[in-house]
């Protein structure tokens, strides 16, 4: 990740509560600002890291006032408030930038809703990309099962599933980048960066 002036990465939005991203950025001495509530602001030389479901930092800087979206009820409250800061940040980012989504199943209804809204209003230059792990017949066929499934049938079903997934994501302005093993992600990121 380049330094902030001329940075290609404008922000990071995470749905995780932990501070693992911050720990990694500290190791490479990149300035960042953790944002997990409405009143937080960042300087132009800081990479904003938005924790849209809340934040639990390491013990040394634990904030007892931080709100977390743990329960389904709390999630629905955020989801139903269109002007909640986390929805506004996500929507603005999705509308104005090319986004790369890693580690998401993209089954979250609020994220899909925001992607759909952004796809309707975004410029034609904005595209989003999502790394999604390709399902394999190995993950679906259990050799110890007494029920035998035809491998060719499973492959056909998976192929159809992947095509449907791609079309569905395309309607949300997002192109799927398939991977089979997590070790492929750094290589794919290097290819994208070039």
Where are the language model's segments positioned?
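SIR2/sirtuin-family catalytic core signature
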Residues: 1-10, 27-48, 59, 87-194
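Substrate-recognition element of Asp-dependent hydrolases with the DxDx(T/V) motif
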Residues: 13
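Active-site glycine-centered loops adjacent to acidic/histidine catalytic or metal-binding residues
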Residues: 16
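Active-site micro-motifs of SAM-dependent methyltransferase domains
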Residues: 19
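Conserved subregion of the PPM/PP2C metallophosphatase catalytic domain
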Residues: 22-26
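Active-site glycine-rich loop that binds ribose-phosphate moieties when present
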Residues: 34, 69-88
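Active-site-proximal helix-loop elements at catalytic-domain edges
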Residues: 53-76
């Amino acid at each position: 990740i380049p330094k902030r002036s001329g940075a290609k990465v404008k922000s990071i939005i995470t749905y995780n509560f932990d501070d693992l991203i911050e720990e990694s950025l500290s190791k490479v001495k990149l300035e960042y600002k953790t944002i997990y509530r409405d009143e937080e602001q960042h300087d132009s030389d800081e990479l904003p890291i938005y924790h849209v479901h809340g934040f639990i930092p390491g013990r040394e800087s634990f904030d007892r006032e931080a709100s977390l979206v743990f329960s389904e009820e709390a999630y629905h409250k955020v989801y139903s408030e269109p002007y909640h800061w986390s929805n506004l940040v996500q929507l603005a980012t999705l509308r104005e930038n090319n986004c790369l989504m890693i580690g998401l199943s993209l089954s979250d209804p609020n994220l899909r809703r925001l992607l759909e809204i952004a796809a309707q209003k975004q410029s034609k230059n904005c595209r989003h990309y999502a790394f999604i792990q390709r399902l394999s017949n190995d993950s679906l066929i259990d050799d110890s099962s007494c029920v035998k499934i035809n491998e060719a049938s499973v492959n056909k079903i998976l192929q159809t599933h992947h095509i449907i997934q791609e079309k569905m994501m395309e309607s949300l302005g997002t192109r799927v980048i398939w991977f089979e093993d997590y070790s492929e992600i750094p290589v794919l990121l290097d290819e994208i960066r070039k």
